[in-house]
Structures are given as structure tokens and as C-alpha cells.
């Protein structure tokens, strides 16, 4: 499996706090106003050879793992703060071993929220580092 698929699987196996919206997996997603969601996305941002000679060096791959929370409009911040705390306990500055990778998660960064339809959306991001041959 790809790194993205394995991180998504880890998230799916360990996230039980609100519904996951799989918008990155070619699935139709139509959020309802009375439910809250976590929407994960992963982007590969760079690959660098970390050693010399380059033909034998490890490759350092960098990714961004974003989880946007869609919370009910005008519902306060308590549920959002709980989701962020749970996300921190899963990934903040941790190494996660999947079937084929050791994934190094950086610190959690919570960005400014905004209204999107009937939800208040709050993006949260991690930098991921993975070494490969």
C-alpha cells in the first residue's frame, strides 16, 4: 500500500470521535448540518536524497497531513477542542509504525476556522517525514 493509504487506514482504525468524511478517496460526500466530521487529506510536498553517494542514500519524503473538522454552526468550541485533544493524543510529535512505513509526525498546528455552509471548518495540520530507499 502507499504511504497515504496506510496513514488513512491508521486514522480510520483509531478515530472514533466523529464521522470521517472521505473526500480524498473518490467517495461522494455530502455533509449534513446536524453531524460533525473529520476530513483527512495528505499531500506529498518534497523528496530529497539525505546521503552521499546519492545512489545509496536514503530519500527523505515530506508530506502534509491535514484534518479539517466540520463542527455544527453556533455550537460553541467544546466539541472542537475535544477533537483537537484527541488528534494530539494520536499523532502530535509521535512516530507511527504502519505495515510498511515508520511515519514521523511533527507538532499539531491548528489554523483559523471559517464558515463553510452549515458548519464551522477548522483545519489542523501535521508535517510528516518518511525515509525510504
Where are these regions (language model features)?
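Small/polar-rich, solvent-exposed N-terminal microdomains that initiate assembly or binding
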Residues: 1-57, 75-77, 82-83, 89-90, ...
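Acidic-leaning, charged glycine-interspersed low-complexity segments
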Residues: 21, 88-133
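Solvent-exposed, well-ordered amphipathic alpha-helical segments
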Residues: 40-44, 62-67, 84-88, 105-108
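Short, solvent-exposed beta-strand/turn "edge" segments of beta-rich domains on protein surfaces
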Residues: 52-60, 114-119
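Oligomerization/assembly interface segments of phage tail-like spikes and tubes
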Residues: 59-73, 120-131
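Charge-dense, low-complexity intrinsically disordered segments
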Residues: 74, 78, 113-116
